[in-house]
Amino acid sequence: MNDALALVFDVGTQSVRAMLFDAAGHIVRSAQDIYEQPYYSRNPNWAEQRPDFYFEHICIVSQRLKDQSPEDFARAASVAVTVFRDTTVCMGKDGRPLRDCILWMDQRRAENPKPLPADRKALFALAGMTETIEMLHRTSACNWIAENEPELWKETDKYVCLSTYLNYRLTGRIADSSASLMAKIPYDYKNRKWDKNGLTRCVYDIPQDKLCEILPSGSVVGGVTPEASRLTGIPAGLPMLATGSDKGCETIGLSVIREDQAALSFGTSCTVQFTTRKYFEPTPFMPAYPAVPNDMYNPEIQILRGYWMLTWFKQNFAQAEVEAAKALGCSAEEILNKHLGDIPAGSDGLLVLPHWTPGLSTPNTRGAMIGFTDHHTKYHMYRAIIEGLNFALMDGMYGMERRSGQKIRHLYLGGGGSRSDEICQITANMFGLPVSRIQTHESCALGAAICSFVSLGNFTSYEDAIAHMVRIRDTFTPDAEEHKLYDRIYREVYRRYYRAVTPLHKLLGAITRKEK
């Protein structure tokens, strides 16, 4: 039907949003439910939440959306859910969770995971990847559970991604899109199937029968069950479509489909993603993720603590702005962003390495602020954090360009940080590339809607769907002089400092761990 809508749930770290999109990319209706407590911590650096917490919020926001306009809600021809990554669920034989989710930001480690085979350890050492593999091995939730909750692990019938579990709650089928399975699990990202004998299979030694069914992106997972219909208000039998992860959907939603484009996501974590038909590892042993289009990939570099760092800064250094924002009815970030123009490019020599949490491929990195003098203010720190995040993303983008032979000529921004004109302009100046925003900040949900309408047959290809559903709202042109300055800082200082200080960070970590 020509007036059909796509119902999309965007399940985030902080909230769930429900949206109805038309085939022109317009949001016809939307509703949001913000979590009062996104997660709880039983120990420092732990983060957990009930799996059904997210389904319950889907139910709340779905009913809220239906109440806005039952007529529009009834026009939904499909439903799709896109979810944050690297969060898994232990399901019992009855389909119920056996424990709460260990969320993606959780930093616990297995102390004595199952030893890796000697021949594999030798190969990892030969490739110079011992520390990265050890970090992957120890930080995998499955290995922590197997070590610390062995009886529960034995009882686990299925070990699935959160997205898979939500599919199950809606349809009764334990299946997921090949573009949603981004977690520490034995997945062959290149071939979109479970890895049975690959080199890194031993790192996540999960029995094959504990894993879910894999579907091509755009497939029908199943019809909404009568029970899910009762709880959500979604008509029973409405087809649920397999789409992709939040970052993968966001990249498509930002219209990044060509090999001269890159998507920058300025969310809780920051990423730079390409879309490419050729598979290549963005860094050694780190896979390119399957893209929402089934014949494409999304190589990515991620800064785990991305725009979360602005929250960290706000909590520790910007109480005055927080109080002022309450009085003005705006966010503290809006007030802080107005001061960005008061600080020159390069933050008067203050430089940030934004690795408050080390990445999987860089286990010895740590965060740092260098270059302090007595005239620096908190506003210098704020701008330096934004610049530091961009330097790290630039470093990741340049590395992927070298490994792929691609040349990026245009950037597309999504995530909360992209709402700021000042941040967008700084980004254009630093990368020396035009930076564009699309018609909506809901690029993740839009990407899931694009996948939905391709699956429903409204469009013959993703390129066709993007042409009809995505519009450029504004573009920021780089300032050539500022780019020259940033390029010098990156090449002459940032890269050299990063390489020089990483061994010291490793030593410092070893010393302080021993002291504990």
Which stretches of residues belong to each language-model region?
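N-terminal phosphate-binding loop and adjacent alpha-helix
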Residues: 32-74
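ATP-dependent carbohydrate kinase catalytic cores
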Residues: 189-294, 327-338, 410, 418-428
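A polyampholytic, Gly/Pro-enriched intrinsically disordered region
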Residues: 52-54, 118-133, 233-234, 260-263, ...
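Glycine/Thr-rich phosphate-binding loops that ligate phosphate moieties of nucleotide
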Residues: 1-34, 77-118, 151, 218-221, ...
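Buried hydrophobic packing segments
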Residues: 138-145, 170, 186, 250-254, ...
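Phosphate/pyrophosphate-binding loops at sites that engage ATP/ADP/AMP, CoA/4′-phosphopantetheine
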Residues: 58-77, 148-153, 196-208, 230-232, ...
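Short glycine-aspartate micro-motif
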Residues: 4-10, 73-81, 159, 239-253, ...
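Gly/Ser/Thr-rich active-site cleft segment
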Residues: 11-13, 24, 91, 125-245, ...
